Amino acid sequence: MQPLKRIPSIANFKKLIILTAMCCSSFFYSNTYAENSTLAAVPQVELSQYLGLWYEVARKPMYFQKECAQDVTARYTVNEYGNIAVDNRCTDMDGNILRSLGEGFVVNEPFNSKLKVSFLPESVRWMPVGRGDYWILKIDSAYQMVLVGEPKRKYLWLLSRDPHPDEAKVTEYLRYAQRVGFNLKDLIRTKQTE
């Protein structure tokens, strides 16, 4: 004869449902809070250290990068107007190098952590239209890795001075992005062949 099995009581089911609801609501609340909270840029960026070549490690989908298959880089220099010249490059599926030139305008001097970037033709870049937010959200003290995003959390880039950075550091930066409200379900990891 088999021993009788204990049937959970209604009270235990209610407790389980309440506990599950509390856990789910706290998870939902924390994610919603992060997504709706104000996004903060780093306190200050030393532009002279930020300039130079960066390799893209990962990104959220961006319409102007839809043809980029690998080897995405960004080079930042100071242009003749004292703004940031942006030279983005990538390789498409056919092996062609694609290039996009733009200009970044610092909007929070002297802190230099928030820019507006335009990829409009050079002759009309002076107009304050067609400029996207480019906020530096996290950067290490040696300026070797940077997380860049924008306040609506639709776009995000993880850049590194090394085409193949330490995976633990990559994970650290991506976890930070999640903590401040970025949904990384559509994150694209960039292939670098260098």
Please identify what each model-predicted range represents.
Residues P3-I17:
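Bacterial N-terminal signal peptides that target proteins for export
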Residues I17-F27:
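Bacterial N-terminal signal peptides
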